[in-house]
Amino acid sequence: MTAAVPAGATGRAKKVVVFDYGFGNVRSAERALARAGADVEITRDYDKAMNADGLLVPGVGAFAACMEGLKAARGDWIVDRRLSGGRPVMGICVGMQILFSRGIEHDVEAEGLDEWPGTVGPLEADVVPHMGWNTVEAPADSQLFAGLDADARFYFVHSYAVHEWTQESHNPLIAEPRVTWSTHGKPFVAAVENGALWATQFHPEKSGDAGAQLLTNWIETL
């Protein structure tokens, strides 16, 4: 599968900033986004992060450490400001986890960005970490997984996850977030599409053709 080159009506490649706050596979993300047709830059520069068509927030390591690094780089403020203006943001792996209310790792609790209610906790499975390829169950109307077969597999490497989704708008004028699930022992949230904010627990940049199509789908919405 070859990813199409997304561009606006003018043919300009979409500008995507991979936010460099010290906790993420920034080079892998840069290469994957470039292959998907984006004009990519790795930076923590405030103006560039704010003005890009899309902002990608990667994340590896401990929840609390990632939050500290993000705050030190003013990334928490940048994410909030972009979302307040309807500007697209995508989180990957721990970059998704920190979008929730809090994380608990080794009995250490840390506050997240609280864009979504929920707690990141240990995987409830016989084998931890969850490392390798797995399928997902995406909503039928998912934009993120558009064009992908139901048996498409994505690459995961994590020991913590969100096992319950509790956000409900109760407002018929507001679209409910699209939540995608995967299972390792117990079902967990594998991806979320919520207006301008999308995120995946797995690594699309390491997920071969399926990951390339997913990133293309995101870029085409920018």
Curated annotation (Swiss-Prot):
EC number: 4.3.2.10, 3.5.1.2
Any single GO BP term: L-histidine biosynthetic process
Keyword Nucleotide-binding: no
UniProt keyword terms in alphabetical order: Amino-acid biosynthesis, Cytoplasm, Glutamine amidotransferase, Histidine biosynthesis, Hydrolase, Lyase
Domain Glutamine amidotransferase type-1: 15-222
Superkingdom as given in the UniProt entry: Bacteria
Single GO MF descriptor: lyase activity
KW Cytoplasm (keyword) present: yes
An example Gene Ontology CC term for this record: cytoplasm
Compartments where located: Cytoplasm
CDD domains cross-referenced by the UniProt entry: GATase1_IGP_Synthase
SUPFAM superfamilies reported in the protein's UniProt record: Class I glutamine amidotransferase-like (SSF52317)
Catalytic reaction list: 5-[(5-phospho-1-deoxy-D-ribulos-1-ylimino)methylamino]-1-(5-phospho-beta-D-ribosyl)imidazole-4-carboxamide + L-glutamine = D-erythro-1-(imidazol-4-yl)glycerol 3-phosphate + 5-amino-1-(5-phospho-beta-D-ribosyl)imidazole-4-carboxamide + L-glutamate + H(+); L-glutamine + H2O = L-glutamate + NH4(+)
Residues at the active site: 93 (nucleophile), 203, 205
Pathway(s) annotated for this protein in UniProt: Amino-acid biosynthesis; L-histidine biosynthesis; L-histidine from 5-phospho-alpha-D-ribose 1-diphosphate: step 5/9
Ranges in coiled-coil conformation: none
HAMAP family named among the record's database cross-references: HisH (MF_00278)
NCBIfam families assigned to the protein according to its UniProt record, in alphabetical order: IMP_synth_hisH
PANTHER family, A to Z: IMIDAZOLE GLYCEROL PHOSPHATE SYNTHASE SUBUNIT HISH (PTHR42701:SF1)
Subunit structure: Heterodimer of HisH and HisF.
Cited function: IGPS catalyzes the conversion of PRFAR and glutamine to IGP, AICAR and glutamate. The HisH subunit catalyzes the hydrolysis of glutamine to glutamate and ammonia as part of the synthesis of IGP and AICAR. The resulting ammonia molecule is channeled to the active site of HisF.
Name listed for the protein in its UniProt record: Imidazole glycerol phosphate synthase subunit HisH
Source species: Streptomyces coelicolor (strain ATCC BAA-471 / A3(2) / M145)
Gene: hisH
